Regions:
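Short, glycine-/aromatic-enriched active-site segment of Class I SAM-dependent methyltransferases
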Residues: 148-166
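Conserved Class I S-adenosyl-L-methionine
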Residues: 185-253
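Conserved alpha-helix/loop element of class I SAM-dependent methyltransferases that forms part
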Residues: 22-25, 33-55, 65-69
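A short acidic, Gly/Pro-enriched loop at the edge of an enzyme's catalytic core
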Residues: 109-119
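A short glycine-rich, Lys/Arg-flanked "PGG" loop and its adjoining helix->strand segment in the class I
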Residues: 127-143
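Class I SAM-dependent methyltransferase SAM/SAH-binding core
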Residues: 55-109
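N-terminal, positively charged/glycine-rich alpha-helical extensions of SAM-dependent methyltransferases
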Residues: 1-27, 36
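Acceptor-substrate binding/catalytic loop of class I
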Residues: 160-174, 215-217
């Protein structure tokens, strides 16, 4: 094992630069691998339903990168975001295009009128089924890909054993019921558990600081012994591995 002092300095360096622009994980590209073979294609599903005259809202758009990739007519496009650095980014990139962007961090109070949208999309963001029902036109669709409650749990246990699940109800069975009770018809519902692997501890440190809600209270100082154990595993096995949890819901009002 490398000198512990040097490792700690290296990991603290990763910790200090754990900031992202939009939702950009390029800093650890090649140093980790996340299962991309999800058995559905979120973008293709959206395009299946999207017509040029449809009014679409991307709630919790991040930096707007995915929304812009759809190339939907800007006059029929709206977006919200609540994370301050991303809000500023959206103001700089989306508003000049004519996209109806509004700052919003409360999924139960979205600042648009009743029945404003034909399609609402949301990837890995918050949502409130009753509020979505209010915002959608009759026959309108909500399409979401979500991170489930079991996401990265093995990795959390490696460094913060005993940490409670932050959102225990985020799974397909419970959320499908929530949407049905809110008056939606479920058109598609799928769930997937896929591997995530880290090839160096520094990449994991950066990741854990970015995904701070999954790793509450994590720091190199606090978890140093656990990180050393992770380092040993990587030296012996070439990686540390966990599991991602994703689910998809397409619901019609």
């Amino acid at each position: 094992m490398n000198n512990e002092f040097e490792l700690k300095q290296l990991w603290q360096s990763e910790e200090s630069i754990a900031h992202i622009h939009g939702w950009d994980f390029s800093h650890i590209h090649g140093r980790y691998e996340e299962g991309n073979d999800i058995p559905w294609n979120y973008e293709e599903i959206i395009r299946q339903y999207l017509t040029s005259d449809a009014r679409i809202l991307d709630f919790d758009t991040g930096g707007g990168e995915f929304l812009l990739s759809l190339h939907h007519p800007y006059k029929n496009t709206a977006a919200t975001e609540g994370f301050p650095p991303n809000v500023q980014l959206c103001k700089e990139t989306l508003l000049p295009l004519g996209i109806d962007f509004k700052e919003c961090s409360d999924a139960a109070n979205i600042p648009f009128e009743d029945e404003s949208f034909d399609i609402i999309i949301n990837r890995h963001g918050d949502f409130n089924a009753k509020e979505l029902h209010r915002l959608l036109k009759k026959g309108g669709l909500f399409i979401t890909q979500q991170v489930g409650s079991e996401n990265d749990r093995e990795l959390v246990e490696m460094v913060l054993p005993g940490t409670p699940k932050q959102f225990p109800d985020l799974n397909l069975t419970k959320q499908q019921k929530v949407f049905e009770e809110a008056g939606f018809e479920i058109l598609q519902a799928e769930e997937a558990f896929l591997p995530i692997k880290f090839y160096d501890v520094g990449a994991f440190v950066w990741f854990a600081r970015i995904i701070e809600w999954e790793f509450p209270g994590f720091s190199v100082d606090k978890c140093f012994d656990k990180l050393l154990a992770m380092q040993k595993t990587i030296e012996e096995q070439g990686e540390v591995a966990g599991t991602t949890h994703r689910y998809l819901i397409v619901a019609r009002k």
